[in-house]
Amino acid sequence: MRKTKVDVVVIGAGQAGLAISYYLTRAKIEHVILERGSIANAWKNERWDSFCLVTPNWTINLPSALPSSVDPDAFMKKDDFVKLLENWAKSFRAPVMEGVCVSDLSRTGEDFKILTDSHIFLANQVIIATATYQRPKVPQMLRNLDPQWELKTAIDYKNPSSLREGAVLVVGSGQSGCQIAEELNNAGRSTYLSIGHTGRLPRRYRGADCIKWQLEMGWLDRRADFLDDPKKRFSGDPHLSGKNGGYTLSLHELRTSGVKLLGRIVSRDGPVLKLKGDVKTALQASDRYAIEFRRSVDEFIRNSGRTVPLPSRLELHGEPQGSAFDFEEIEQLDLLSENISTVIVATGFEFDFSWVKFPVLDETGYPKTNRGVTSVPGLYFMGLNWMYKRKSGIIYGVADDAEYIAEKVSTSKQRYYSTEADL
């Protein structure tokens, strides 16, 4: 197997990998980016056709990436965002090697050894920018579903016409699950949605987008030690949509429009799913999240002395109406009798860093870092959930972390060559 020695290897060519490449290029540090697919691979191949970003375009603050012609308050479609990342990579000649899958990261002598499907790379420093979401979670009781039902995950789903005829069960009520269920229902498919206790964010409130308020209130700059439980790094994001200019995505509205809401799946006996019967408490949890968010904004406005408009009727869209809780809980669902042909699982993702053969992972297998810097000199991570701040794992935050890590790489490089010169 061919061997190549490079100064720095970056693993992953999404927004995090490209951001670190931008700053390494600016510092004239030799590096290569290894990408298992192509640039922006997850955005390109693991999102449904109509996918839009749920954060406004102004959050795409990658240096020199966003064209001035783009409306900062609009929401970019998937294909447009992919094209933006591709064009950005071309603009600074990002050294991306596509179709190179890394399977092992270890040490050989003084070098990092990166094993791929066709190549061995040796490097002085390595930056892992594969983010947190490597593979979809699938509940145990659904993993061995009979082939007569098509089992898909959110990354497999493309559009309603790509599915078998019949009703569809969507499992999971985070951003993906709710948006997919809405699209299926709007396409005339009989749609069931198994919901959890995920929050709802009002798309806009008191004249500004909810993400703008989060920025203004300092929520995006909250540090990881703000969390009282490290597991909250992986909590499901509240549901909302950037489609058609962006709007509040409400479980109440989905139910009113015809989506059949179900509680959590407890177990399965053949085609019959036993349900927890907790739809009402899940709806209340979603409502509570929205109420608490608005209360936080109101308090922030009062304390800052700002003059902003009162909430409009449209901004309060999605709130429960008079008969919102007037229904009977469903305790079980028979996939056969309900003519369900497809089950789409949208219950989040799992990380897998088992290929990293260094003592830099905690008891759950998640990287332990200080703003991306590990205890192993020369080994770094990028784009992780709450890696340094809340924004570290989203588009808005990767540039700040990339600039910081690039400086660490540069400092380490200078120290490395100074040591060599002294020998």
Give residue spans per PLM region.
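Flavin (primarily FAD) cofactor-binding/catalytic cores of flavoenzymes
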Residues: 2-13, 19-42, 76-423
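N-terminal glycine-rich dinucleotide-binding loop that anchors FAD/FMN and/or NAD(P) in oxidoreductases
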Residues: 46-71, 210-227
